[in-house]
Amino acid sequence: MEKVRYMISDAAAAVDVETHVLRYWEDELGLDVPRNELGHRYYTRDNIKQFLRIKELKEKGYQLRAIRDMLH
């Protein structure tokens, strides 16, 4: 079964953030987001779930450093 892939704009809409926020979180948190043959990011449902968790933790006041520790 093939995994559903989402473009960054679709993933950002699902998480209700701007695309630059997803890229920032990827960089700051060391997240491994797959890329296609052209180097474009694509996201899975698991990636979106992870971003929703990150957003929830940010809204609760956690800093990215603490979130990174929780994720790794």
Over which residues does each language-model region extend?
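Basic helix-turn-helix/winged-helix DNA-binding cores
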Residues: M1-H72
